[in-house]
Amino acid sequence: MRGQKLAPGDYHLIVHACLFNDAGRLLIQQRQTTKKGWPGLWDVSAGGSALHGETSAQAAAREGREELGLSLDLSGVRPAFTLHFAAGFDDVYILRQNVQVEDLTLQPEEVAAVRFATLAEVQALLQSGRFVPYPKTLLPLYFETAGF
């Protein structure tokens, strides 16, 4: 349950979906200023916590649907990366999907804005403190894995 301390041997599963278009741009979202973690900062396309009993693919598809109104078919898709942190794991899905920003339905409690960005634009946001503070080598790896 959210906010409860994990029992010994239990881990938290986080998921992220990184959507790239054919032009090599990553769909990024700006977190609402009311969010507890990293308010107002830009982040990758969609992400959040898996619910009890969900697979990471189910959680990533749900987050895409909830936050952006996107239908993501992740059946049979494995995460490109599983990142480890002290309390758990973060499964990262790298996806290629051409979507139009104006066709997205943003979840107002979570997402303030979305746009597509190049790696250089994402790195500039990161360097200026306006992007969730991922390790500086991580986002270039996402672009490279997507083929850009």
Q: What is each model feature region?
A:
Residues 1-16, 22:
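Acidic, metal-coordinating catalytic segment for phosphate/diphosphate chemistry
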Residues 2-3, 39-40, 81-148:
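Nudix hydrolase/Nudix homology domain
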Residues 8, 37, 51-55:
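Residues at secondary-structure transition points
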Residues 14-46:
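A glycine-rich, hydrophobic loop/mini-helix early in the fold
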Residues 18-20, 71, 83:
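Short, conserved, surface-exposed binding loops centered on an aromatic residue
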Residues 28, 45-78:
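The catalytic Nudix box helix
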